[in-house]
Design a protein with these regions (language model features):
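Walker A/P-loop nucleotide-binding motif
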Residues: 107-125
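A short, basic N-terminal segment
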Residues: 1-97, 257-267
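Loop/turn-to-beta-strand initiation segments
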Residues: 137-138, 171-175, 208-216
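P-loop NTPase Walker A phosphate-binding motif
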Residues: 122-136
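Short glycine-rich substrate-engagement loop in P-loop NTPases that contacts/grips substrate
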Residues: 132-171, 188
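N-terminal flanking helix/linker immediately upstream of nucleotide/cofactor-binding cores
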Residues: 97-103
Length: 267
């Protein structure tokens, strides 16, 4: 019988019906219309250890169910984020060193630089996909041309669309911007709207007004940023101080010692 002994102070010694261990718990002699129901509840009461095990098993089952749901929606979430189809199912990175660096720095805003073929886009997609396996981050992938076109459209439309454009970006966990600078020599001066957009994004990270992690991917060779912007020093300083920077080159270690702003320069 689960109730072994009634003690003083409204407590009793019970025998756990699952593990047969004795334990003490609150007990009041059942009375009235619900006496049979309360007595049955006492008879089925289990010990704290078995209760904790049931709760742990329940949490494990719920976590496994959440994981299965995350995996079931993974491809669709990558597509809705805007990643090109060929990068939506990245279960293995093309360039391991690049992917490892991005994974290790996934909690930061990034400026990932390197020539075509160094795995910037594929690694970003791989890391975002790995994050999506564990949670539901709000992610947007855009090439620079796509994002700039959306910004220009917002600026030239009434009803405060420019405000809502940035508000939407501010709600993201990750904004991945690809192809800001292509092959060496392809960096050309951004339009005034493009320069405004780039500075707003970089300054938002620098000032901590924007909690979104901004990942900028491109071939930022020496002088590339200067060719993009009329007044490059403020942007370069903010990138240097607020972003994790790295240069990728096939067959060589990741270079994190790059500098795009020197303290002797003044704004």
């Amino acid at each position: 019988m689960p109730i072994k002994e009634v003690l003083h102070d409204d407590r009793a010694v019970f025998v756990c019906p699952e593990c047969q261990k004795e334990f003490t718990a609150e007990y009041r002699e059942p009375e009235g219309a619900f006496a049979a129901y309360r007595r049955d509840a006492y008879e089925r009461q289990i010990c704290p250890d078995c209760t904790a095990k049931h709760e742990a098993d329940k949490r494990t089952a719920e976590a496994e169910q959440r994981k299965l749901m995350l995996l079931a929606t993974l491809d669709d979430r990558m597509a809705r984020a805007g990643f090109p189809e060929k990068f939506r199912k990245m279960d293995k990175p093309f360039v391991r060193d690049t992917a490892v660096w991005m994974w290790q720095n996934r909690q930061h805003s990034l400026l990932a630089s390197g020539a075509t073929g160094t795995g910037k886009t594929s690694s970003a997609a791989f890391v975002i996909r790995e994050i999506m396996k564990q949670s539901r981050p709000r992610v947007m992938y855009r090439t620079w041309q796509m994002l700039q076109a959306e910004f220009v459209k917002a600026k030239t439309t009434d009803n405060d669309n420019e405000f809502y454009f940035f508000e939407r970006l501010d709600e993201l966990d990750y904004l991945v911007i690809d192809e800001l600078v292509g092959k060496r020599g392809e960096a050309t001066r951004l339009s005034p709207s493009g320069q405004d957009l780039l500075f707003n994004l970089v300054d938002g990270v620098y000032s901590e007004a924007r909690k979104t992690r901004v990942w900028i991917l491109g071939n930022f060779y020496d002088g590339a940023i200067d060719r993009l912007i009329d007044d490059p020093l403020p942007t370069r300083r903010r990138l240097q101080e607020s972003f994790k920077l790295a240069w990728f080159e096939r067959g060589k270690p990741v270079d994190e010692n790059i500098s795009i702003y020197e303290e002797i320069e003044t704004e």
